[in-house]
Amino acid sequence: MSVRRTRKDDGSQWTVADSRSVYGIRHWGAGYFAINEAGRVEVRPNGPQSAPIDLFEQVDELRQSGLSLPLLVRFPDILQDRVRQLTGAFDANIARLEYQSQYTALYPIKVNQQEAVVENIIATQNVSIGLEAGSKPELLAVLALAPKGGTIVCNGYKDREFIRLALMGQKLGHNVFIVIEKESEVALVIEEAAELKVKPQVGLRVRLSSLASSKWADTGGEKSKFGLSAAQLLSVVQRFRDAGLDQGIRLLHFHMGSQIANLADYQHGFKEAIRYYGELRALGLPVDHIDVGGGLGVDYDGTHSRNASSINYDMDDYAGVVVGMLKEFCDAQGLPHPHIFSESGRSLTAHHAMLVIQVTDVEKHNDDVPTIENKEALPETVQWLVDLLGPTDIEMVTETYWRATHYMGDVAAQYADGKLSLGEKALAEQCYFAVCRRLHNSLKARQRSHRQVLDELNDKLADKYICNFSVFQSLPDTWAIGQVLPIIPLHRLDEEPMRRAVLQDLTCDSDGKINQYVDEQSIETSMPVHAVKEGEDYLLGVFLVGAYQEILGDMHNLFGDTDSVNIYQNADGSVYHAGIETHDTIEDMLRYVHLSPEELMTHYRDKVASAKITARERTQYLDALRLGLTRSSYLSS
C-alpha cells in the first residue's frame, strides 16, 4: 500500500483511507467518485459496481491531445444512471404501496441546456422521461429534441407566440401541458386554441403558503414569482369553463423551492398542495396529473443533514413521501391516483460534471524569522513578540495566541502613528506568524477549549493558491449564493496534506475566490492541500458542478468558456472522448462586447508605426499582438 513518508500524531502512517476521510469523498461522491490505492481520484460513471476511470490519467491524456486547463469534464453515463435511480425509486414505491398510476421524471432544461445533457437524459432506456421548458428558446429546443409522443410541460411567462408554439407541439404529436402561471395567459390560450382548432391540455400552478427553508425558498411560498392564489385559481377555472375548455384542465403544478434540505419541510408543503388536487376534482375538473415541481436536493457537503448544502434524505425517502402521501389522501377522499411528475433537474445533473483547475502560484505568510542581533534595540512591542517565539506550556497555548494577536494590534497602531519603521513592522509580522504556526501545531481539534483558536489560525495561516480559472465563469453559485462544492486534489492522496489553502481565481476582483470547503464532516474556510513541488502541475477537481453552473457563468474580466469534453465508458470498461469543445479565444470574448479584433489590429498597426522602435521590433510586436488575439483568455497551462 502506498503511504505517506511521515507519520501522523498517533504514530501511524498516512494512507489513502485518511484522505478519503479528510475530503469526505465517500459521503458526497454518491458512489461515483472515490480515491484509489495509488492516491488518485477515480470515477465510476455507471455506479459503484462499474469499472473505475483514473481521472488524473484521463486529464493527462486529454492535455497531451491538445486540450488545456481549466477543463470541464462531463460524464454523460452518470446522467443516465441518475435517471434510472430516480425513476427506480418512484417505481419501487409505487409497487410497494400499490399506487394505481405511474411516474414520469421531467427534466427542466434550464438546469443545463447542453445538447449532450438533454439528449443523454431522454435517451435513457426503459424509463418514463419528459422535458420542461420555461422560455421560448427552451420550448423550441424541446420540441425538436423530445421524441414523438413525449411529455413536454411549459412553465414560465408566456406570450401569444409561446402558446402558439406549444399548441403546435401538441398537434405534432407531443403530450404538451401549458401551465397557467398568470391569469393573463388564459385569454391567449383560449384564442390560440380556437385559431389552431386544438383542445389544449392545461395545467394550473398554485402558489402555496408553505415555505421550505433553503437558499431558494422565495421560489415557493406566497412571495413566489409564479403561481395562482386561491381566488385567482377559481377565476381561471371559471374562464376556461365559460370557453368550454375546462375539461382540458389535466394537471396541478406547484413548486416549493430548489434544494430542500429537510424532508419534513417538503412533507408540510405537500400536505397543502394535495388539498388543491381534491378541490379541483370536486369542481368537476378531470385533473389526473400532479407535477410536484423541484426540491429534490443534492448532498454537496456529504453531511446528510439540514445544512443548505446538504439533504437529510435520499431519493427513495423522497419518492416514498410523494407516493405515500398522495395515496393516503386519495384513498381517504375516494379519488383516483394521479400520474406523478417531478422536476428534479439538480439531482439528475449535478454529479455528471467536474472542473479541473491547476495551481499556478502559491502565496504563503513569511514566518521565517531572521537572526536578531540586538533585541533590546527593538521597540518594546516587537520585543514582546520576539519573546513569544520561545517554548510555550501546553496549558498556555490559547493565552499565548491572544497575547500575540493583541501585540500585533499595537504594532499596526504604532506603525500608523509613525512610531515603527517598515523594517520593524515586517519583523513583527514574521514573529507573529512564526508564533501562530508553532501554536497551530500544538492545538488539538478534539479539545473544545482549542477549537476557536484553531479555527482562527486555520484562516490566518492558510496559503493562497492562485488557480487558473474564473469563479464567475465556472462556479458562479459559489460567489452569488455561497454554494458549497466539494474540492479535492486529483493526485498525491497517498500523502498527507500538510498545508491549508484558500483558492483564488485569475479575475481582478476580490470576490474571485472560494470561501467554503468540505472538510471531513464540516464546512471550513480553507481546505487541506499538499505543498506544491517545484515544476509540478498540482491539479484540483471541483465536483458536482453539472447543475446551473455552466449556463449561469458570466464573462467577468472577459474570461470565457473553458475547454470541455464528454467522457463515455464502454461496456468493457474502456473509455472514449466525444463532444470536445475548445475554449473561447480572446478574440471571441472581445467580439461579445462588440470590440472588433480587426479594428483593434488597425489601431495596433497605427501605434506600432508611430512608435520609436526598429523595423524588426515592429514586426515582432504586431506578430505578438495578432497571436495574442487567438489565445485562450486563461493562462497557458
Curated annotation (Swiss-Prot):
Q: Which residues take part in binding substrate?
A: 290-300
Q: Which domain of life is it from?
A: Bacteria
Give the UniProt keywords, A-Z: Decarboxylase, Lyase, Magnesium, Metal-binding, Polyamine biosynthesis, Pyridoxal phosphate, Spermidine biosynthesis
On this chain, the residues bearing N6-(pyridoxal phosphate)lysine are 110
What EC number is given for this enzyme?
4.1.1.19
Which reactions fall under this protein's catalytic activity? L-arginine + H(+) = agmatine + CO2
UniProt-listed Pfam families = Arg_decarb_HB, Arg_decarbox_C, Orn_Arg_deC_N
- Supply the CDD domains for this chain: PLPDE_III_ADC
Biological process (GO) annotations held by this record are: arginine catabolic process; putrescine biosynthetic process from arginine; spermidine biosynthetic process
GO MF terms, alphabetically ordered: arginine decarboxylase activity; metal ion binding
Q: What is the purpose of this protein?
A: Catalyzes the biosynthesis of agmatine from arginine.
Q: Which family does it belong to?
A: Belongs to the Orn/Lys/Arg decarboxylase class-II family. SpeA subfamily.
Q: What is this protein called?
A: Biosynthetic arginine decarboxylase
Organism in which the protein naturally occurs: Pseudomonas putida (strain ATCC 47054 / DSM 6125 / CFBP 8728 / NCIMB 11950 / KT2440)
